Amino acid sequence: MSEYIETVSTEDANAVIDSKLRKVFDGRIVRKDLTKKIKEGANVPVYVLEFLLGQYCSSDDEDVIETGVANVKRILAENYVRPDEAQKILSVLRQRGSYTVIDKITVNLNIKTDSYEAEFSNLGIKAIPISEDYPTKYDRLLCGGIWCIVQLEYEYVEEDKRRSPILIHKLTPIQMPHVDIEELKQGRKAFTQEEWIKILLRSIGMEPDKLNDRERWLLLARMLPLVENNFNLCELGPRSTGKSHIYKEISPNSILVSGGQTTVANLFYNMGRKTVGLVGLWDCVAFDEVAGINFKDKDGIQIMKDCMASGSFARGKEEKAATASMVFVGNINQSVDVLLKTSSLFDPFPPEMGTDTAFLDRMHCYIPGWEIPKFRPEHFTNDYGFITDYLAEFIRELRKEQYGDALDKYFRLGKNLNQRDTIAVRKMVGGMIKLLYPDGEFTKEQLEEILKFALEMRRRVKEQLKKLGGMEFYDVNFSYIDNDTFEEHFVSVPEQGGGKLIPEGMCNPGQVYTVSQGKSGMIGVFRLESQMLPGNGKFERTGLNSDGKCKEAANTAFNYLKANGNRISGTISTTTKDYIINYQDLQGIGMTEKLALPTLIALCSIALGKPTLSSLAVLGEISIAGTMLKVDELANALQVCLDSGAKKVLLPITSAADLGTAPADLIGCFNLIFYQSAEDAVYKALGVE
C-alpha cells in the first residue's frame, strides 16, 4: 500500500512540474519520449528535432501530439538536406524555380562588397546573398550558424552571370534564434530546488525518479564544463554510464574527440594556415576513451597544460586565448578498491599523462563514475523537459556570469587548500549555482550543500596526487569555516575508507610487508610470503624474475642468517630445511632492491613459526655485514605506510634524525619501533623482548 501511495505522490509531483513548465516555458519544452521515437529513424541533430516537436507537439492532448509528430516526420522527409542528395535538390530547385530546405546556415559579412552572404552546410553552397535583416534579427547566424527552414528561389539572368542564381526568399530559424536570459531567471522562481533539478535532468534525457540524490548531483556535475569557462573535468568509470552522451548529443556547443591520435594543429593552432583549433571554436572539448589519447607532437601535452591552467597558449610569436573547457572521460577496467590499493584513480590515462602530477593537478573536478548506475531503458525519461537547444543556449549565456565569490559571504576555505584547489572549488561552486540557481537566489544551507560537493570533487584529485607525488601534495584535509560560528567542517571522499594493502590483524608466519623505492623511483608496498620445507638448506626466490640486484639482496639475507642464525635463535636451521620466498610488487612500480632486511625477518618468522606484529610495515635495509642503512625519503615512505593501512612502523635508529622532515600529525599516526641492529629488527618485528 505504501508503495502505491509513493507512486501516486510521485506522479502528482510530476504533473505539477509539467503544468508549471507549460505555463512558464511554453514553446520551450518538449516531451522526451517523442524525441526518442523520431530520433531512431532520422539522422538529424536532437536540438533540431526537439525544436520542431516544441512547435507542433507542445500540448497534453494526444490527438494534437499525434498530428504534430506526423507533421514533424513529413517536414523532415521532404525538406531535410542529406549531404549525398545535395546535387539532386539543387537540380529540383532549378527545375521548379523554388524549393524549401532544412539546413545549417552560417552568415558572413563580405567587406569588399559590403553585403551579407550565407553558407549552407549540407547543401554545400556558399556566397548566397541574404538580406541584412536576418543576421540583425538572429545574431546566432553570425556566431557559428543555426539550423533553419529556408525558402529558396532560382533565377538565372543571362546578362548578369556574376550574380548567384540562387536567392533566399524567406528564412525561419529552427533553433532558438535568441535566448532571453532574464526570462529564464524569472521562470526559475516558479520552481523548488528539487523540481528544477528534475527539469534539468529530464532536459538531458534522464529520468530523475530512477536516481537517488547523489546520482542526480553527479549527473549535474557533467554539465559544469558547459556552464563554466576553462573548466577541466575528469570522469572515469564503468562502461554504459553515459559519460560522453551530454557532450555529443545534448549541446551543439561542445565537440567529442574520440580517443586516438590528435595534433597540436587540430586542437590548438595551425601555424601554416594561421587558424585556431578546436579549443578556440568550441565551448567544450571532450576526449573520449582517455587511454587512447596520443599527441603526434612532443609539445602537445605541454601546450595542453598551459591551456588548462591559464586559458591561453603560445604558438609561434603570439599568445592565443581559449575559453574552452576540457573533459576527459574513459573506462575503469578494475574495481575502485583494487585501483586505490595498487595504483591511482588516474590509472586509465596514458603513462605520460597519468603519472604527470603537473597535468593532473590542473583537473578541477573528478566525478566518481563508478557511483553512477549502468543505464537501462527506464533511466531515460518520457516526461517534459527543455528543448535541448534552449537548454544548451541558456547554459552558454550563463558562461558570461560569475558566482565564484558567492561563498565568501557565509564561508571561507580551510588552510589545506592551495591556490589551484581554491580556483577549482570556486569554479565548481560558481558553476553549480548557475545550474541550480540561475536567478542568484539561494540560502546559506543550499550554498553549503554545493560547497561540500565541490570540495569532495577536488579532494579526489588531490588524494591521487598525494599517491603519485608524495609530500608535495600532503595537504588533503580539505575544510571550510563558517563565518558566523567559526566552526571548521572537514570534507572527505567516500572511497578512501576502502580496503588496505597492509591488513589489520595478525599475518601468517613468514609474511612481511615492506615499504621502499621501486624500480620506477616511486615508493610502494611489497609483500613477502614464505614457506619452509624439510630439505638440505636450499633457498628459492620467486617473483624476482631475472633481476640480479634483487636476488643479490635476498641472498645477502640468507647468508647473514646462515652466519648469525644461532645468535637469533638456536632453533633456526639453515641445513635441514629448505626456504621459499615469493616477492610481490603490490602497486606495479617495479620490484625494490632493498630486500635484505625484509627477507631476514620473513625467514626468521617462518623458521620460528611466529608472525610479525599486526599492521606492521618494515622500513630500512642492511648490508652484507649487517650494517643498518637509512631510509630514503622518510616522509614520503611514512605517507605510503599510512595510505596502505600500516599502524606500526619498524625504523632504523639512524633514521630518527630525519623525522623532522615529516609533518608531526603524520608521525602521530603510527607506533614507531626503532631497531639498532639486524637481530634487534627481527626481535622487534616478531614482538620478542
Where are the language model's segments positioned?
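Peripheral, non-AAA+ core regions of ATP-driven protein-machinery
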Residues: G497-E689
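Conserved ASCE/P-loop NTPase catalytic core
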Residues: E207-D347, D361, D475-E495
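Extended, charged/polar low-complexity intrinsically disordered regions
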Residues: S2-S203
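Short glycine-/polar-rich loops that comprise or flank the Walker A/P-loop
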Residues: F231, W282, A322-S325, F359-C365, ...
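Phosphate-sensing "switch" segment of ASCE/P-loop ATPases
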Residues: E319-M326, N331-L436, G440
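Dynamic helix-loop-helix/coil hinge segments at AAA+ ATPase domain boundaries and subdomain interfaces
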Residues: E183-W217, L544-K551, K630-E633
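Short, basic, glycine/proline-bearing loop/turn elements
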Residues: L201-K210, S258-G259, V618-T627
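C-terminal helical "lid" subdomain and adjoining coupling/linker elements of P-loop NTPases
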Residues: F375-H379, D405-I481, F486-E504, G590
